[in-house]
Amino acid sequence: MSLVWLEAMLPLGIIGGMLCIMGNSQYYIHKAYHGRPKHIGHDEWDVAMERRDKKVVEKAAAPSS
């Protein structure tokens, strides 16, 4: 009777394992598709700043005539 709690550990372990597998698969799929890990807390402001930075770098790299 002292190992009754062990009966609940198997389903709990399966559920926890599946949650870990789902989280890791999302990470690796996103990394494979975008080429970099997902940014945590990445909002519209960060996206706008990335676009601005990309334009500035392209403008600086373009040959001036």
Curated annotation (Swiss-Prot):
Its main location: mitochondrion. It is found in: Mitochondrion inner membrane. GO terms for cellular component: mitochondrial inner membrane; mitochondrion. The chain crosses the membrane at residues 3-23. InterPro entries: NADH_Ub_cplx-1_asu_su-1. It is a single-pass membrane protein. Keywords: Electron transport, Membrane, Mitochondrion, Mitochondrion inner membrane, Respiratory chain, Transmembrane, Transmembrane helix, Transport. Complex I is composed of at least 49 different subunits. Accessory subunit of the mitochondrial membrane respiratory chain NADH dehydrogenase (Complex I), that is believed not to be involved in catalysis. Complex I functions in the transfer of electrons from NADH to the respiratory chain. The immediate electron acceptor for the enzyme is believed to be ubiquinone. Belongs to the complex I NDUFA1 subunit family. This is NADH dehydrogenase [ubiquinone] 1 alpha subcomplex subunit 1.
